[in-house]
């Protein structure tokens, strides 16, 4: 019963980005540069990652 997980890392600063993109990064649980979180791979999380793909790095 292990759900598939992905690791998301913030690799670019949110300074100068849209407010909604900053909120999405916070919604993913990322707080500072090079901060990594492990999230369950759901369509909602995938959509958030796609929205801010230019700010984050994703590992399976």
Swiss-Prot record:
InterPro entries: Ribo_uL30_ferredoxin-like_sf, Ribosomal_uL30_bac-type, Ribosomal_uL30_CS, Ribosomal_uL30_ferredoxin-like. The keyword Ribosomal protein applies. SUPFAM superfamilies: Ribosomal protein L30p/L7e. It comes from Azoarcus sp. (strain BH72). Keywords: Ribonucleoprotein, Ribosomal protein. CDD domains: Ribosomal_L30. This is Large ribosomal subunit protein uL30. One of its GO terms (cellular component) is cytosolic large ribosomal subunit. Disulfide bonds: none annotated. Pfam families: Ribosomal_L30 (PF00327). GO terms for molecular function: structural constituent of ribosome. PROSITE patterns: RIBOSOMAL_L30. The keyword Ribonucleoprotein applies. It comes from the Bacteria. Belongs to the universal ribosomal protein uL30 family. Part of the 50S ribosomal subunit. One of its GO terms (biological process) is translation.
